[in-house]
């Protein structure tokens, strides 16, 4: 499961994951 920000899939990945404003990719 990959957690990433809608605006920047590669930036601050873990931070956005922890904050909760994330999008989840089933890949």
Curated annotation (Swiss-Prot):
Keywords: Acetylcholine receptor inhibiting toxin, Ion channel impairing toxin, Neurotoxin, Postsynaptic neurotoxin, Secreted, Toxin
Tissue-wise expression: Expressed by the venom gland.
Location(s) in or outside the cell: Secreted
Principal place of residence: secreted
Family membership noted in the UniProt record: Belongs to the three-finger toxin family. Short-chain subfamily. Type I alpha-neurotoxin sub-subfamily.
Protein role: Binds to muscle nicotinic acetylcholine receptor (nAChR) and inhibit acetylcholine from binding to the receptor, thereby impairing neuromuscular transmission.
The keyword rRNA-binding is assigned to this record: no
Protein name: Weak neurotoxin E3
GO cellular component: extracellular region
GO molecular function: acetylcholine receptor inhibitor activity; ion channel regulator activity; toxin activity
């Amino acid at each position: 499961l990959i957690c990433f920000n809608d605006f920047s899939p590669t930036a601050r990945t873990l931070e956005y994951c922890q904050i909760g404003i994330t999008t989840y990719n089933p890949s």
